[in-house]
Amino acid sequence: MSAPQLLVHDHRDNVGVVVVEGLAAGSEMLCVITEDDFDFRLTVKQAVPIGHKVALTDLKVGDTAVKYGQDIGRIVAPVARGEHVHTHNLRTKRW
């Protein structure tokens, strides 16, 4: 298997983390779920910086973003599968 561009930690996750520099819009990524090494392909719709998240499914306003099998926040703007997930469309539920 070649090196993955996106890591997902848990099968419950609906976002994954970009682990390469220079990921361009339209790139087909090799994605790996680290829990069991399951792999799949996903096309990224925007350029996404290393360390940032990508939606694995379509997410609507009010949905919970899940990373590491844990709630990491609430979606505040619609996000399509393959789009960048960050502070412009994700907020903490703490306040």
Give the role of each language-model region.
Residues 2-95:
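N-terminal small-residue-enriched
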